[in-house]
Every structure is written in C-alpha cells, then in structure tokens.
C-alpha cells in the first residue's frame, strides 16, 4: 500500500528549481518547471548519477553526467545512453506542503 510523505513546502522550490530529499530511504527529487511540479527518483537509470545535478527544460530533465534525458511526467528515457525509464511518484500539494506517494 502506498504511503503519503511530506517532502517540503511548495515555496521552497523556485520556478525552474529542484529540491532533493531522502524520503523513507528513497532519493526523491521535486522539480518545478513551467508552473508544474514533478516528483522523480533522484537517480539516472544509465549509471545512477543524481539527476538533481542536471538541467531542466520544460518537462525534460537532462543528466549532467552523460546527457541522458527523461520525461518528468512519465519517466520515459528520451535519448541514449539511457534506455530504462526513471521512477516517477504521484504528488499533491495540501496547504502549501508537497506530499509524495511511495510504494
């Protein structure tokens, strides 16, 4: 069963910003881009480099290590060298607090 966990306040993340945190031993990255929030596992599926070091444009995050790109909504790998998707987590904002659901 999924559990909802508070990660941070929405105001902690500037537009086009990122917020990395450990939630129940899971490395979670919250991304705010174009007014939307996304929650992903903070780990590139190519060589496990932290995606929090990468760049964001629209709904795409690019790994700083080797240039792999992922769709923030679906986790789908968009280009080599990554072929495996990243984990995405459901999130919701309640009274300004961002919560993620982990399995």
How does the language model describe each region?
Residues 80:
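Short glycine/proline-centered loop/turn elements that form peptide/ligand docking sites
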Residues 44, 63-66:
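Short cysteine clusters
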Residues 1-58, 71-72, 76, 85-103:
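N-terminal pre-ligand scaffold of iron-sulfur
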């Amino acid at each position: 069963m999924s559990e909802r966990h508070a990660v941070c306040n929405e105001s902690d993340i500037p537009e086009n910003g990122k917020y990395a945190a450990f939630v129940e031993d899971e490395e979670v990255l919250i991304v705010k881009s174009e007014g939307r929030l996304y929650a992903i596992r903070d780990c590139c599926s190519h060589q496990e480099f932290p995606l929090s070091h990468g760049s964001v444009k629209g709904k795409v995050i690019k790994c700083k290590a080797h240039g792999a790109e992922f769709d923030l909504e679906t986790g789908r790998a968009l280009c080599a060298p990554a072929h495996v998707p990243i984990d995405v987590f459901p999130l919701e904002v309640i009274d300004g607090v961002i919560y993620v659901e982990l399995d």
